[in-house]
């Protein structure tokens, strides 16, 4: 079966790991905090590298960016230097990741107006995340996210939106039980949805350690196959070609690991595996009861059902 092929190449820069939301499953949880002025100057320098001309899309990711992270005037000034530089460059698309669990008026609105004034709003993709459990630890947080999504739709319709959802066991349960309709959610949010496999990240040693903290975070293989049959084969609410493709992710990312910038140079190659600087961190993905990858299971099911 053919995988989804991205029409362009995408370079992404992590600014920092700082974020107040405190998701227990976050792959950046409790990472070493980096000096934000150093990080922003590092990215300004990287944007001068000739390598950027290999890519026609660019992205910025935290941590979080627009909650309290750029409160300090010097940090904010440097952040806007980065944005100004990006806006002046050759990039056809600009990805900006944010959790949307904060007061938009503090920083995000100013940033969106800045991007509008630069005339790049049609290039910008606001990337956020939704999860059935552990992300919204209070009802207030969920309401804030939903309110901000509605506000983006009404006040900033010229900015496209994108949502990532982790294929956790909990999420799959809500879908299989009929408590969450993927197609309706996408329509309600007016946003493209992509699904990513759960990972133990840079904080936990392995899947079992994270599963003990967030029960049902990693799905069983059997449960995932039921989800595939229902949502990919029968309802076609999920594009299986994207599930088995690394090309929905950035091609190259400057990622923080143990307080250091690490270049993940070709994340779209088949079989790409994140390797942590801390040898105890396995960065495991997939199922709690199998070492098979989500990709392998998707392909095997498609072959068995002769699905194109």
Regions found by a protein language model. Give the residues of each.
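Flexible mid-to-C-terminal extensions adjoining Fe-S/redox cofactors in radical SAM and related proteins
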Residues: 250-308
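Radical SAM enzyme [4Fe-4S]-AdoMet core and its adjacent flexible, acidic
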Residues: 120-269
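Distinct, well-ordered alpha-helical segments
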Residues: 71-81, 104-116, 139-141, 174-182
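Short, intrinsically disordered, charge-biased short linear motifs at domain edges
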Residues: 6-14, 240-252, 281-291
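Core AdoMet radical
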Residues: 30-38, 54-75, 88-105, 119-147, ...
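Leucine-rich repeat
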Residues: 45-52, 81-87, 114-118, 184-185
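Canonical Radical SAM [4Fe-4S] cluster-binding loop centered on the CxxxCxxC motif
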Residues: 1-42
